[in-house]
Amino acid sequence: MPRAWILKSRPKGMPQPSDFELVNLPAQSLGEGQFRVANRWLSVDPYMRGRMNDVKSYVPPFALGDPMQGGAVGEVIESRNPGFAPGDTVLHMAGWRDEAVIGAEAMPQKLPALRVPEETFLHNLGLTGGTAYFGLLRTAEARQGDTVFVSAAAGAVGSAV
């Protein structure tokens, strides 16, 4: 039976273990074009704290009782999608679950076989690293010899710069 971490209550200050709950989910059959992933890595990112509040922002807040959304890396274990075969390693946004049925809405990406740990695709080779890289080189147009100041409060992206 698949399991997922849900947001049980909205944190007051620092999130506490009591704000979350590990729950059993009903088993899902695969639809055409979907595949099942056994997750090996889940991402816990700074932006998630803001989504735990019930306020309007650039992304909707997490819904109480729903599985936490976020990046994950896992292995395809069953597939009805010709682009994804059992054994493929994928990055997706189905979130904090041990197993997930993936469709296009989870934005799956098959990961290349590189000599880096696969969890690297959740940070330095993922959204955080890409934002740092393109922000520094394309937006700021930093060049060799430039001095760059990165605030101590720059968060995950700043730490990747």
Range-by-range predicted roles:
Residues G70-E75, A85-A152:
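NAD(P)H dinucleotide-binding glycine-rich loop of Rossmann-like/cofactor-binding domains
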Residues L7-G13, L42-V44:
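Short polar catalytic/cofactor-binding loops
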Residues M14-P26:
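Short glycine/threonine/proline-enriched tight-turn/helix- or strand-capping micro-motif at secondary-structure
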Residues I6, A27, E78, V101-I102:
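Conserved hydrophobic "DFG−1" position in protein kinase catalytic cores
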Residues G158-S159:
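N-terminal Rossmann-fold NAD(P) dinucleotide-binding loop
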Residues M1-W5:
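Short structural boundary motif marking the start of a folded domain
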Residues P26-V44, M52-W96:
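Glycine-rich beta-strand-centered segment in the early N-terminal region that forms part
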